[in-house]
From Swiss-Prot:
Native species: Vibrio atlanticus (strain LGP32) (Vibrio splendidus (strain Mel32))
Protein name: S-ribosylhomocysteine lyase
Gene that encodes the chain: luxS
Similarity comment text for this entry: Belongs to the LuxS family.
EC number, as in UniProt: 4.4.1.21
Superkingdom classification of source: Bacteria
Amino acid sequence: MPLLDSFTVDHTRMNAPAVRVAKTMQTPKGDTITVFDLRFTAPNKDILSERGIHTLEHLYAGFMRAHLNGSAVEIIDISPMGCRTGFYMSLIGTPSEQQVAEAWLAAMQDVLKVENQNKIPELNEYQCGTAAMHSLDEAKEIANAIIAAGISVNKNDELALPESMLQELKID
């Protein structure tokens, strides 16, 4: 099984909250797709609450689009990580980590402005697979924590696992 890019970086050294360019690739037509690791919490140290991350999933994608999309950037998808320490964001374009961090902070401010649970987009049984699993309060706690901490940048070259360690950790 091929080793995915996200598993070639040392999760014990990641800062959080932080932005990292996880991957860039070119489409056959020449567009650049950039995948960002938006790390909300330090891996293996903290975890986003189930209800909080689910509510953020509904809010964050729209708010990030409002702050980052433009003539040179179009967000394709923002999805929570299975480990519940952040989100992956795939987009067309190459915004800087700083631009992404600024949009992220603005999106967290937007989360704080959501008045009540009834204002969460697509929170119904027709558009959400687990409509009962939401908490606006927990999403706001996460947003407040991000704003208070600020957002740094994780660089792949600083986090790269040595090839010898990757071979040692490999499961055949």
